[in-house]
Each structure stands twice: as structure tokens, then as C-alpha cells.
Amino acid sequence: MPESTPFAAPGPELWSRLGWTPDAGQREQLITLQELLRDWNTRVNLTRLVEGEDFWVTQVLDSLWPLKPELDTADTPRRCIDVGTGGGFPGLAVAIALPGAELTLVDSVSRKTAAVAAMARSLGMADRVSVRTERVERTGQDPRCRGQFDLALARAVASAPVVAEYLVPLLHTNGQALLYRGRWQQEDQRDLDPALALLKAKTVAIERCELPSARGPRTVIRVMPEQPTPHLYPRAVGIPSKQPLGIQADDNRS
């Protein structure tokens, strides 16, 4: 049976939770994005979160609430990167909400990146949304990407120390990494802090949100570089997830 709650469609209740309301064009783009995702999902297994609250709360709202400061200056030119974009979230939702931004969306699965690139074209955003099919460890060592971004985003990719190693090398001096997390506790921060020390970065803010309709707690960890990231990071493909910084012994602490 289709959901009939206030959060199952793009109405005022949804936007009041975000503190931001899309203009008519953005609202139409978000509706079109749902239609495109529904269509592509019949051909490529992108996500099960396509209908009703699954889409509007767990995809759109969850993608955008960490960006409340940026939504206040949505037309400001920014370079943003979404690591592990999967079915295009948060990247495509962010591109709609921040019309001044250029987005780079990264995923290692070619069938997913092909679908996401096609959706970006259908949404009329191909001029400012680019898609890369590669492991993010390679992205972070590519001079065209390393140290180039104002915002680096990752949602539901890996543990926080691993995500930090993926994102921090992509930031320029004043850039910020946004680590999308669920519940965040002191022990999570204790795991993250040693990784940030190795990356020459620091936590600058921890923001929390309770998604409506019992969708659970969410946290975003904002991280900034304090110095240029050591060239070692990110390490070779697969190493960050197998040997998370600060959790397992690291031979490069000295």
C-alpha cells in the first residue's frame, strides 16, 4: 500500500525539517530524479530506496540536511565531490540544491556510474556534474582532484577513519569533508581522532538530526585540513579499509 504520510511527497512538512524550500525548478528536478531513479532501477540495481518516504526522507532529506550552511548560499561557486555515490546520492540531490556548485561523483561500479551520468544529463546538469569510474584511492592521488575541492562528501561508505582517508586528501586548504554517519558516540570520535592526526586534519563540527517517521538518528562530522595531507594518503587501493588509520598499527606514525 502506498505511503500517505506528510513525508512521502515533496511538501512543506519535508522542507520545514530541512529549513530550506526548493524553488519550482528545483522541485521539478527532484521529482524527475525520482522518476529517473525508478526507471534506471529496473535495469541496474542502484537502490531499494525509490518510493515514498524511502526516497524523500532517506534519500533527499538525508542527503541535504548536513548542508544547511551551504543551502543559505546555494548560488556560490563551489567544487564538490561525492565519494561512493552509488545511485547518485548525495551527489545528484546536492547538485540540484546548490545550483552554483560543480559536482564530481565517484564510484567504482561502471554500471552505476553510467546510470548516474545518464540521470545527470536528463536533469540538464551535465555541464556541472561529472562522473568518474574508479576507486577513490586513485582519485585522491590524481593531481586533477587532489587538493581541489571545497566540499568532499561520503554517505554509507565505510568506517569514519576509512572515509576520512578517502576525503581529506581531496580538500584544498579551506575545504571541508562531510562524513555522513548514523548514531555517533564518544568511542567513534576516539577512533577518528588518531586518523585525523595522521592526515593533518581536525574535526570542526559535529551536527545531529533525527530523521522523521522513525528513520533514525543522523550525524555529520565536519573535518578540515590543518596542513597539506601527507603524500602517502590515501594509501593503495584496498589498504585503507583493511588497515584503518589509527585503529590498527600504522608503520608510518614515525
From Swiss-Prot:
<feature type="binding site">
    <location>
        <position position="155"/>
    </location>
    <ligand>
        <name>S-adenosyl-L-methionine</name>
    </ligand>
</feature>
<dbReference type="InterPro" id="IPR003682">
    <property type="entry name" value="rRNA_ssu_MeTfrase_G"/>
</dbReference>
<comment type="similarity">
    <text>Belongs to the methyltransferase superfamily. RNA methyltransferase RsmG family.</text>
</comment>
<comment type="function">
    <text>Specifically methylates the N7 position of a guanine in 16S rRNA.</text>
</comment>
<keyword id="KW-0949">S-adenosyl-L-methionine</keyword>
<dbReference type="Pfam" id="PF02527">
    <property type="entry name" value="GidB"/>
</dbReference>
<feature type="binding site">
    <location>
        <position position="89"/>
    </location>
    <ligand>
        <name>S-adenosyl-L-methionine</name>
    </ligand>
</feature>
<feature type="region of interest" description="Disordered">
    <location>
        <begin position="231"/>
        <end position="254"/>
    </location>
</feature>
<dbReference type="GO" id="GO:0005829">
    <property type="term" value="C:cytosol"/>
</dbReference>
<keyword id="KW-0489">Methyltransferase</keyword>
<keyword id="KW-0963">Cytoplasm</keyword>
<feature type="binding site">
    <location>
        <begin position="136"/>
        <end position="137"/>
    </location>
    <ligand>
        <name>S-adenosyl-L-methionine</name>
    </ligand>
</feature>
<protein>
    <recommendedName>
        <fullName>Ribosomal RNA small subunit methyltransferase G</fullName>
        <ecNumber>2.1.1.-</ecNumber>
    </recommendedName>
</protein>
<keyword id="KW-0698">rRNA processing</keyword>
<dbReference type="InterPro" id="IPR029063">
    <property type="entry name" value="SAM-dependent_MTases_sf"/>
</dbReference>
<feature type="binding site">
    <location>
        <position position="84"/>
    </location>
    <ligand>
        <name>S-adenosyl-L-methionine</name>
    </ligand>
</feature>
<dbReference type="GO" id="GO:0070043">
    <property type="term" value="F:rRNA (guanine-N7-)-methyltransferase activity"/>
</dbReference>
<keyword id="KW-0808">Transferase</keyword>
